[in-house]
Amino acid sequence: SNNIGPMMFEHITTADLVVFNRCTDELKDMLYKKNIKAMNPRAAIYLDDVNGNSEDYARNMPLPFDVDADIIDIQPEDYGLWYIDATGDPMKYDGKTVRFLAQAYVGKDVPAGSFVPGRFGMVCCADDVTFLGFLCRYPDRDQLHNRDWVKVTASITVEELPQYRGPGPVLHAITVEPAEKAKED
């Protein structure tokens, strides 16, 4: 079961629904630690126990931050969990304010007056590192350079964007401040 990522990665990343059957408590704990949701944030994932009871994986995934706080402070080591949760359930964050450390992406494919604050994340293996971030509307975007480290405080709305292929979180910058590089980037 320690090799679940490489064995199941392709199946999980392309599925709309993933069901793990006959889960013991130990298997459930292992699946939460492996963060299966990271492999496909938009998939519905259920854990069925040996008695046939079904558990919604996302609903029971513990989050290390308070989504009801006035400002949701995302610690650097928790960015990936927040990204996955916000991608899978954007309405949970609609109207909320978040603060996090990120790198700026200001490529030509980003609309004027916007940038993408994000982090590089690994879903399955080292060859699978990708930039994970949400569009952030920020009128002073021209002051940023690619890979600048910034501390972002932003309000969130849920909008339909082609990049999201459906509704997703859009950040509206309140503050964007220069920051020190994360210990683990």
Residue ranges, per PLM feature:
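OB-fold and OB-like single-stranded nucleic-acid-recognition modules
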Residues: 1-8, 12-185
